[in-house]
Amino acid sequence: MKSLRSSFMLFLGLSLSLLFTFAALATRNPIQPSAAAPKYHTHFVYYDVQKMTTTTLFTIEGEWHAPNWTPDGRYIVSDQGDDLYRIPVSGADKGKPEKINVSQKMAATNDHALSWDGKQIAITSLAAPNRTPTGLHNVILIMNMDGSAAHEVHLGWLHGWSPNDKYLVYAQDQEGNFDIYRVDSDGSGELRMTTGKGRDDGPEFSADGKWVYFCSDRSGKFDGWRMPADGAGPGDKLVEKVTSGGDTQDWFPHISPDGKWLYTISYPMDHPDHSYIGDGMKIKMLRLQNGVGAKGAKLTTVRTFFGGQGSGNTGGWSPDSKKFAWTEYETIPEKLN
């Protein structure tokens, strides 16, 4: 019995010793919640149309999307996480993001565009619960460039403003089909612009305000199309194909302000769904003649890279039409602890 009691006391002593040791270690090295390290470095890249060269403007940690050049050429507006930022493109603060403090709760998406006068930002936010039957909650907000006076305008996946800043154009699945819509910037006067089968997406106005360019798979794969600014008409008879052929799914045709060039964000042919992120993404360009590809002209690849839809789903042209920007991703190797 004495031996059993001694054994028990020895076991108890060892247990308490181990407990105090672990407690001391925990106090000295407390376990912290692990912050998720950014998955990517993002390279902000631009193509110089005249020099036909590609240059990395700057690199930032994290996954950044859809660079929009401000009309004065001094900043790029981009999103990361739930927030919007403006980033100086030159000077001592080049490449240092400045958060835009939005006056309303917002969960940013990469669907954002600047008004042509440079005074406002429109963006699709996901922070609007119970607003759509699909549960996507994609509401368009308009705000001043500093984030003030943010207010809801309409539901939709925003892609652009009209040159007079009167209208917004966006894509939305409202009647069982993804189509292009236009609405006044105050949220009134919605106009359904396309009604054809297939997915229509990525609408943008031409600088003269006469046309809306968009991408569609209505011909079997994604290509660039355009229609008059008042819509495609009955049966979409007024749509006109702008790009064709090729070995890629060509999304989001972005028209230069001078109307001479178009570039696309192009996916590998076996990835028609634009949620893809990976290798084989391409930037393609087309010289325009009267708003469409010149006779015999085809999209030309200027860059192949690791990226995705957020690399440039809204326009990245500089105001002088000399260059355009997009984002490329570089995977950050996992650190072994």
Give the location of each predicted region.
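Blade/loop signatures of beta-propeller domains
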Residues: 30-52
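Hydrophobic beta-strand positions that form the internal "hydrophobic ladder"
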Residues: 76, 121, 165-168, 212, ...
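Residue-level detector of Asp-centered blade-edge/turn motifs that repeat once per structural unit
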Residues: 71-72, 116-117, 163-164, 207-208, ...
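Bacterial N-terminal signal peptides
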Residues: 11-21
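Short loop/turn segments that connect beta-strands within beta-propeller blades
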Residues: 49-50, 89-93, 144-148, 184-188, ...
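A flexible loop/linker signature enriched in serine peptidases of the S9 family
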Residues: 34-39, 60-64, 76-85, 102-109, ...
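A short beta-strand motif characteristic of beta-propeller blades
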Residues: 53-58, 97-102, 149-153, 189-194, ...
